[in-house]
Amino acid sequence: EVNASIAGRYYQIGAIRAVTERFESKRREALLVMATGTGKTRTATALVDVMQKAKWAKRILFLVDRRALRDQALSAYKEHLNEPLVYPREGDREFPLDRRVYVQTYHTMLGVVQKQKQYVSPFFFDLIIADEAHRSLFHVFKEIIDYFDALKLGLTATPKDKVHASSYALFNCDKGMPTYEYPYEQAVGDGFLNDFEVLKVR
């Protein structure tokens, strides 16, 4: 059951259910398309909570493309999951093997895969969540995704018709058919986002 205090909006719950149903049907990859500002990180955090409680996933890797997003995600996991076993935390110098939630930039994790394969098994993670999957993955970081034998979830705010075909292929979705979509127009219509106008300044 989804913890509504983490992600209680109807579309967040719908996204989590769509992903878990896909995993239950033995599909090992999923892709969420959610507009910026609709709570992708909260949705991912609530999904981790569901999967850990159901014992579907013990160790989770959350990939981001910038350190600022890494820090934001770390704060979310610590706050909403009361999770002390996260990586990185202050004082960490090496890649530890005793944590439950790992939050890393793609570049840092690529270094781990390339240089520390003897320490990190392909079966180490049970779930990998890739944030901003549209731009950060296919060419440069596909090596990370291919190395680990885990359930995989891509997150992106890019409208589904703008997501590159390679991203759909990476998460085993037909082009234009993400696992779940909550677009900008729907978020505005629901009152969760404010519409905007582009003004030309002369």
Feature map (PLM): residue ranges:
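Short beta-alpha junctions and helix-cap segments that line functional grooves
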Residues: 47, 74-76, 87-91, 115-116, ...
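Conserved helicase motor
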Residues: 67-68, 88-95, 106-111
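ATP-dependent helicase/translocase motor core
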Residues: 1-59, 68, 72-83, 97-101, ...
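Structural beta-sheet core signal
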Residues: 32, 62-63, 154
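A short acidic, often aromatic-flanked loop/helix-cap motif at beta-alpha or helix-coil junctions
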Residues: 92-97, 186-190
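Cofactor-binding loop segments of dinucleotide-utilizing enzymes, especially the Rossmann-like FAD-
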Residues: 65-66, 157
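Conserved AMP-binding/adenylation subdomain of ANL enzymes
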Residues: 83-85, 191
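Signature of the SF2 helicase/ATPase Hel1-core->accessory helical subdomain module
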Residues: 110-202
